[in-house]
Curated annotation (Swiss-Prot):
Composition skew (Polar residues), residue ranges: 471-485
Catalysis performed (reactions): L-cysteinyl-[protein] + hexadecanoyl-CoA = S-hexadecanoyl-L-cysteinyl-[protein] + CoA
Name of this chain's protein: Palmitoyltransferase ZDHHC8
Organism: Mus musculus
Compositionally skewed regions (Pro residues) per UniProt: 408-417, 511-521
Length: 762
């Protein structure tokens, strides 16, 4: 009757065993008290001795069968049966003495039951050599306690026979006084013994047969070996010997000894010797960015160096905008090099600065004026130095000019324009040279584009090796402001140049320049040709550098404005809409008014018509057309809502400020000089091409319209009005009747990078 510690006590299952024990002990006691004294005097004193010894043997076997472990197999742990799949077969066959015996999977105990093993539904355990569950002993009868159960049956049967026999003898001798107490009690004991004698004798005989045949009650009832051969039999004598004389089987389940818990915990719950030996170190940043706290003993701490932990390379110094700009303009007179170069520091870099090379600290070139010449060491040729533009070259980004009230805004802060035409041409050559070094490799011959009929310009400059972006940084700050060469050459405005010059395709050619390939034709119907994006963006420059450029630009522009005697002819061009019948008639025509230029919408032919623009040789007109063509050729287009909002502002009766509607916030209120071109801008990865225009020989407008039928567009409406209503009157513009596209006799060619060519009727 072993019970696991977690099982609940059920009184009902103890009723049979309590009844059996009470009957056994009660009847035997009454027999020994009322019957045995007379038997001892009348028959023999050996009768009480025999019955007493037999009673003790019955009681001992009963106790062993009740409280002994029958041979319970322990259940499998959760991690023990992981190898057995839940889809494993329900049965497995094993060979026992050449005979296959089936083993069944136990879903409760999670293992295959050994042969002759069965799961007891009452005890809920798998018992080895399971015979049956006996309620009279409240225990399973298995391999370990079957011997005691069998002996209990044998001894109980003998004891019951003795009690009934000796009781009957007492009654027969006291038949005259059946009403006496001793005779009545003896008759009651005989009735109890006789009542249980038949089932006990029957059960004992059944188990005698099973023992002699080598079977269990479970095997006999289920008929496992019925009509077959029993592989577990050892013969009659061998089976009896195995049951009665074999050594006791081991116990598989051992309850842990219950020992009192005598553990005293101290408040810190830490061993003091560990605190003395272990000294925690500072938190160290591992290579993967995780913080790891390490501890070492005092002995190892004595051998540590005094240098601090390596937490990565130091961050670059932060320089305020005012100090940085002042150092650029006034170099320190302490050394000769400081007079020729500007101290440049690395701007703050992103979080991955560990994997990006630092900026170069080579010799720098100061800003070169028109009449200054800076001597310097010998330099390499331009073709060799073009190969130094390797990886990690940041692509600067020029921002698009801000639009008007209804227009678009660039997503990045606007970049200020460069100071002079020399700086502008130097920046353009930097863009072209970097694109050529990426595509061509070493000693690549750069073929510039040529603008037919354009006036010659003296603004040609060269880049020294240190003026180009090197492999260790992005486009330097000096390359934006200092296009001059430190290699002993003259400034860009001087005609005497020592080495082979490179002509940018974005500048007007000189009289001695090689001929350029003719521009390719363009058809708006077929769509534009694929163009390569500009390789340069200025969005990687730090805000400190850009702020200093803006500050210097504003100061020099104000000084130039004081010296300038003429007002600005025009501002930045408007934004052209998509090439459709609606948008081909929209162009930006600027006429000079009392306070500045007035923006006017008309056809594309109105752009270059009239005497107000000074003819085809006007460089300001060419710059305006370049900005217009670049705005027409970039994608994505501006929305119609922003264009109509600009038109509504332009249709106002009063004149507008001279700065135009499309100005960046940094340039509002500052009219540009007449001949100073404005730097185009790049936003994100958009490519804007610099387009040069020229005026070829006069051609009939009818031929142009026949070649390009898409220019013949029906009249469209702007803001609900016809194109004629949308334009300003003759009083606001000196164009007069020349605004009609049907009266022009010239064809204007607008060519750009990538083979894009526009023809505009003049």
């Amino acid at each position: 009757m072993p019970r696991s510690p977690g099982t609940r006590l059920k009184p009902a299952k103890y009723i049979p065993v309590a009844t059996a024990a009470a009957l056994l002990v009660g009847s035997s006691t009454l027999f020994f008290v009322f019957t045995c004294p007379w038997l001892t005097r009348a028959v023999s004193p050996a009768i009480p001795v025999y019955n007493g010894i037999l009673f003790l043997f019955v009681l001992a076997n009963f106790s062993m069968a009740t409280f002994m472990d029958p041979g319970v197999f322990p259940r499998a742990d959760e991690d023990e049966d992981k190898e057995d799949d839940f889809r494993a077969p329900l049965y497995k066959n094993v060979d026992v003495r050449g005979i296959q015996v089936r083993m069944k999977w136990c879903a409760t105990c999670h293992f295959y039951r050994p042969p002759r093993c069965s799961h007891c539904s009452v005890c809920d355990n798998c018992v080895e050599d399971f015979d049956h569950h006996c309620p009279w002993v409240n225990n399973c009868i298995g391999r370990r306690n079957y011997r005691y159960f069998f002996l209990f049956l044998l001894s109980l049967s003998a004891h019951m026979v003795g009690v009934v026999a000796f009781g009957l003898l007492y009654v027969l001798n006291h038949s005259e006084g059946l009403g006496a107490a001793h005779t009545t009690i003896t008759m009651a004991v005989m009735c109890v013994a006789g009542l249980f004698f038949i089932p006990v004798i029957g059960l004992t005989g059944f188990h005698v047969v099973l023992v002699t045949r080598g079977r269990t009650t479970n095997e006999q009832v289920t008929g496992k070996f019925r009509g077959g051969v029993n592989p577990f039999t050892r013969g009659c004598y061998g089976n009896v010997e195995h049951v009665l004389c074999s050594p006791l089987a081991p116990r598989y389940v051992v309850e842990p000894p219950r020992m009192p818990l005598s553990v005293s915990l101290k408040p810190p719950f830490l061993r003091p010797e560990l605190l003395e030996r272990a000294v925690p170190l500072k938190v160290k940043l591992s290579d993967n960015g995780l913080k790891a706290g390490r501890s070492k003993s005092k002995g190892s701490l004595d051998q540590l160096d005094e240098k601090p932990l390596d937490l990565g390379p130091p961050l670059p110094p932060k320089i305020e905008a005012g100090t940085f700009g002042r150092d650029l303009k006034t170099p320190r007179p302490g050394s000769a090099e400081s007079a020729l170069s500007v101290q440049r520091t690395s701007p703050p870099t992103p979080a991955m600065y560990k994997f990006r090379p630092a900026f170069s600290t080579g010799p720098k070139t100061p800003f070169c004026g028109p009449n200054e010449q800076v001597p310097g060491p010998d330099s390499l040729t331009l073709a060799d130095d073009s190969t130094h533009s390797l990886d990690f070259v940041s692509e600067p980004s020029l921002d698009l000019p801000d639009h008007g009230p209804g227009g678009l805004r660039p997503p990045y802060p606007p970049s200020p324009p460069l100071n002079t035409t020399d700086a502008f041409s130097g920046a353009l050559r930097s863009l072209s040279l970097k694109a050529a070094s990426r595509r061509g490799g070493d000693h690549m011959t750069l073929q510039p584009l040529r603008s037919e009929g354009g006036p010659p310009t003296p603004h040609r400059s060269l880049f020294a090796p240190h003026a180009l972006p090197n492999r260790n940084g992005s486009l330097s700050y000096d390359s934006l402001l200092n296009p001059g060469s430190p290699s002993g050459h003259a400034c860009p405005t001087h005609p005497s140049v020592g080495i082979a010059s490179y002509h940018s395709p974005y500048l007007h050619p000189g009289p001695s320049d090689p001929p350029r390939p003719p521009p390719r034709s363009f058809s708006p119907v077929l769509g534009p040709r694929p163009r390569e994006p500009s390789p340069v963006r200025y969005d990687n420059l730090s805000r400190t550098i850009m702020a200093s450029i803006q500050e210097r630009k504003d100061r020099e522009e104000r000084e130039r404005l004081l010296r300038s005697q003429t007002d600005s002819l025009f501002g930045d061009s408007g934004v052209y809409d998509t090439p459709s019948s609606y948008s081909l008639q929209q162009a930006s025509v600027l006429t000079e008014g009392p306070r500045g230029s007035v923006l006017r919408y008309g056809s594309r032919d109105d752009l270059v018509a009239g005497p107000g623009f000074g003819g085809a040789r006007n460089p300001a007109l060419q710059t305006s057309l370049s900005s217009l063509s670049s705005s027409m050729s970039r994608a994505p287009r501006t929305s119609s809502s922003s264009l109509q909002a600009d038109q509504a502002n332009n249709n106002a009766p009063g004149p507008r400020p001279g700065s135009g509607s499309h100005r960046s916030p940094a340039r509002q209120g500052l009219p540009s000089p007449p001949g100073t071109p404005r730097s185009p801008s790049y936003t994100g990865s958009k490519a804007v091409a610099f387009i040069h225009t020229d005026l070829p020989d006069r051609q009939p407008s009818l031929a142009m319209q026949r070649d390009h039928p898409q220019l013949k567009t029906p009249p469209s409406k702007l803001n609900g009005q016809s194109p004629g209503m949308a334009r300003l009157g003759p009083a606001a513009s000196p164009m007069g009747p020349n605004a009609s596209p049907a009266r022009h006799t010239l064809v204007k060619k607008v060519s750009g990078v990538g083979g894009t060519t526009y023809e505009i009727s003049v």
